[in-house]
Amino acid sequence: MATAYQNLSEYDFNSVPDASEMNIGIVVAEWNKNITEKLLEGACNTLEKHGVKPENIVVKRVPGSFELTFGAKRLAETKELDAVIVLGCVVRGDTPHFDYVCSGVTQGITELNLMYDIPFIFGLLTTDTMQQSEDRAGGRYGNKGDEAAVTAIKMVNFSA
């Protein structure tokens, strides 16, 4: 893949719509907290750079990545939000658990996008090593939390 080793967190600031009136929910997994907290920091900083008021960013934590889908659904049901970002990190181990968690979260976020009239943004790192996760949580390949925030803002403004 051509973009596999690029820092995609660099973008044209002016290509992102004003977000000053947006309310954004973020659900972040506590598992691999050293990574997910960096993703959260990146997402919040980027949202604020584009005008989202800190008080309009609702952050909720769930124990692990598999719980992200339920957390996102519950957040969308209980708060008036324009988008929900899910942030997590799953690192491949020696068992098929990685595949089950990644597939479950991917399918769950897809279903939420089809069920609700707001975008649910996939910010789940699915990596083979912890180093790959660190590289994508503020390391040499940027911060995928930043990218999830930009995606959320753009999708709130999406119109067919």
UniProtKB/Swiss-Prot annotation:
Keywords of the record: Riboflavin biosynthesis, Transferase
Pathway membership: Cofactor biosynthesis; riboflavin biosynthesis; riboflavin from 2-hydroxy-3-oxobutyl phosphate and 5-amino-6-(D-ribitylamino)uracil: step 1/2
Catalytic activities: (2S)-2-hydroxy-3-oxobutyl phosphate + 5-amino-6-(D-ribitylamino)uracil = 6,7-dimethyl-8-(1-D-ribityl)lumazine + phosphate + 2 H2O + H(+)
Function of the molecule: Catalyzes the formation of 6,7-dimethyl-8-ribityllumazine by condensation of 5-amino-6-(D-ribitylamino)uracil with 3,4-dihydroxy-2-butanone 4-phosphate. This is the penultimate step in the biosynthesis of riboflavin.
Gene Ontology MF, one: 6,7-dimethyl-8-ribityllumazine synthase activity
Any Pfam family matching the protein: DMRL_synthase
Enzyme Commission number(s) of this protein: 2.5.1.78
Protein name: 6,7-dimethyl-8-ribityllumazine synthase
Family classification: Belongs to the DMRL synthase family.
Binding site for (2S)-2-hydroxy-3-oxobutyl phosphate: 94-95, 136
InterPro entries noted in UniProt: LS, LS/RS, LS/RS_sf
